[in-house]
Structures are given as structure tokens and as C-alpha cells.
Amino acid sequence: RDLHTDNRRQRQMCIRDRSISLADYGMEKYAYDFNYAGAKIAKEVKDEFCNNTKKSEVFVAGSIGPTNRTASLSPDVNDPGYRAISFDDLVNCYSEQVLGLIDGGVDILFVETIFDTLNAKAALFAIDKIKSEKKLDIPVMVSGTITDASGRTLSGQTVEAFVISISHIPLLSIGFNCALGADQLLPYVKRLSNITNTYTSVHPNAGLPNAFGAYDQTATEMSELIENYLKENIINIVGGCCGTKPEHIRLIAEVARNYKPRKI
């Protein structure tokens, strides 16, 4: 609650509720409960702000991150054909999370940090199924992760291939987040902006991690790099990923207010 409140004070328009890899801690059976509770807290912060300010431009996005297993890659280098999880099992796992987020009151579903597009397709399939069952029309955002200088996701897709893979699904936005800082992500978001007619998003890390895994890029440095995206008019939605704090969000929001969003 304190984190959401701090970010809201820094003019964050979209509050993200998130959880990741519960199975690593033997807590996967609580997936629905964690996501329901997290979404409920974020919605309470949103409602409190909107009631106090009489404003309604704040949204809660339910963040659906990567699992600790991939459908396209083998965890065993000696058995490249092996898969640690099936598509159907992923759909079932994602369904629990999606149900928790929706029941908790999110306004948007945000499938993010996608390094394996087949996993993302399982998440999107689960979302579509639940939307049909509940007769809901909730917006869906998608955000991939370019893992290195090759310009590809971990499962080997380029920007263009990634977009084509999910272009059959009605989406609010397509973007990139995590792994890279704002300066490294810029060329890939440019390519994305040129080939999609949906809104685009970017949530970079605060630079690259240092030798201790911490992020040293200051809020001022990051906001200056984000301004390059705004000057080139290639994004509609902007935020931060690893290493970003409320101060980063505040300065990014201040810079973004001076520019119009990308036209589609």
C-alpha cells in the first residue's frame, strides 16, 4: 500500500500490481490469493485518490510476469527437446492469476517481461477464455523483453517477429520492458513504433545492474533518456522497471507532461 501511495503521489497514472515465480518459494497454491489481495490493495489506493481529488484518470494494471518455466526452451542442455511445462499447464497457471487480478478489481491486464512468446500466448489464451466466461471487456497490454545486443527475446524472436506472433489478438498496447536501460531499448522501440498500429509502451530498467546487482542510474539521468522517446514521438505509455523508485516515476511524469503521445 505504501509503495502504491508513494508512486501515486509522484503522478503515476497507472498503478501496477505484481507477483512473480511463486513456485520458487513453494507458494504457487496461493497464486489466486496473492493476486486478489494485491489487486484489492492497489484498487483501494486508486479509489482513495480519486475520491479525494475528484479525478478519474488513475488505473490499476494487473501485472502478469514470466513464470519460472518456459514452453519453448529446454532447461537441460543435454536434452534440447525436453520441456519443463506444457502449454495447457501454463494456461491453467495463468488462469488462476488472471482470476485473482480481475476479482481484485484491476482495470487493465498487463502481460509483461515476455522472454518466451509461447508463454505469453498461454497467458493471452487464459485471459481470452476468462473474459468470455465472465463476459468482460478488459484492456490487455503486452510487453516483451529484449535480452541482449542481438535485439531478440530469449526465445529468439526479433521485434518484428514478436509483433507478428501476437498481432491476431486485440491489444491496448505493445511494448518492451526490463533487461535493458532506456538508452539500450530506444532502437527497438523505434522499430516497434514503425510497424504497429496499437499504442506503444516502454518500461526500461534504471540502467544496467552493477557488479552487486544494484541499479545506479539516477532519476534525473533516466528521465533525460526517456525524453528522447518523447521527442521522437514513438511511445504512448511510459514507466519504469527494475531499479526505478518513486523519484524516477516523478521525474519521468514531469518530462512526459511536456509532450504529446504518439499518434496511431
Predicted regions and their residues:
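Single conserved hydrophobic/aromatic residue that forms the stacking wall/gate
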Residues: 1-11, 15
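N-terminal small/glycine-rich loop or linker at the start of catalytic domains
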Residues: 17-25, 53-89, 136-153, 198-213
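Glycine-rich anion/phosphate-binding loops
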Residues: 25-44, 87-95
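Conserved, mostly hydrophobic/aromatic
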Residues: 42, 101, 109, 174, ...
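Short, acidic/polar
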Residues: 85-100, 154-165, 218-229
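Catalytic beta/alpha-barrel core
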Residues: 90, 94, 107-116, 172-180, ...
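Active-site-adjacent beta->alpha loops and helix N-cap segments on the catalytic face
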Residues: 115-135, 181-196, 245-252
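Catalytic-face loop-and-helix region of soluble metabolic enzyme cores
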Residues: 147-154, 166-237, 250-262
